Every structure is written in structure tokens, then in C-alpha cells.
Amino acid sequence: RLGPLPLDRDHVTALLPHRPPMLMLDGVTELIAGQHARGFKLLADGEPWVQGHFPGNPVMPGVLILESLAQLGAVLALATEPLDPARCDFVFLGVDKAKFTRPIRPGERLDLDVTVLQQRGGTWKLLGEATVAGQRCAQAELLTAILPRQPSPPRRES
């Protein structure tokens, strides 16, 4: 279902519901179901956050680093559980022990690593680490869950 490693952006897009500009994972390079995954995000000059965070000194927002790690965690969960990605969502429940130790800038490759600390039912506790050129930029424990997808309420026309 996942396809052979490495998974490219097309494979990631087939698994996750996220689309640009919120698709924060470009590839998966290593995956051991139920245990660990590695992936990456290539940061372009045209990323939506570049102009405003911060003008003249762009730095990737910490929440987007965490989102990148969570998306890699979702791929790991889909490799572990017999789930249909079209019928479930992988959602954040909480973040603990988040540390941001180095700014991440456009033009860099953000390497991502998630390890399962605990899994119970559809709830996952992951240790995530983000690095650039081998230097740790961020680390956090992510509490996530797999939930059945709910139909979207109908949109009201104005």
C-alpha cells in the first residue's frame, strides 16, 4: 500500500489529505512499521511563511516544524495500522517538551525523524526530531490520534 522506499512527494500526497501549502513532507526515506520513520521537507524561497516570518530574515515557524513531524508520524501510522487514509485523520492532541535550538531557513533541507514512544489503540506518542545538515533544530514529544473522518458540514452560500 505504501510502495517501495523511498517514498516521493506523489506517494506522500496519495497517503495524506494535506495539500500545498500545508503539505509539509516531501519524501520518506526510512520506515520501520510500528517503530520509526525518517523523511524530509525541502524549503523553497517561495514558502508562504517567507515574506512575513520575518521580513528580511525568514525563519520557519516552530508550529510548521511540528506539523512536518506530525505528517511523517501519520505516514508511520498508516504503515503500521490497516487503515484506509481516505477514511481517517491523524490529528494532534498535544505537544510536550518542545525545544527549538536552531533557526531553519529557505533553501535548507529539513530532515525529520519520528520514533514511537507509546501506542495504545488509535493514540500515538511520538518523539520527533528535526535537523538541518546534521544539526538538531527542534525536538518534541507529539501526542496524536487516528480518528474516523467525519463528513464536512455543507457550506453555506452567502
Describe the predicted segments one by one.
Residues 59-85:
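Active-site helix/loop of acyl-thioester processing domains in fatty-acid/polyketide metabolism
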Residues 34, 64, 68, 123-125:
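An amphipathic alpha-helix/helix-turn recognition signal
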Residues 1-59, 84-89, 101-105, 117-123, ...:
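Non-catalytic linker/capping segments at the edges of enzyme domains
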Residues 127-129:
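Generic short beta-strand
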Residues 79, 83, 91-99:
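Conserved short alpha-helical segments that host acidic/polar catalytic motifs at enzyme active sites
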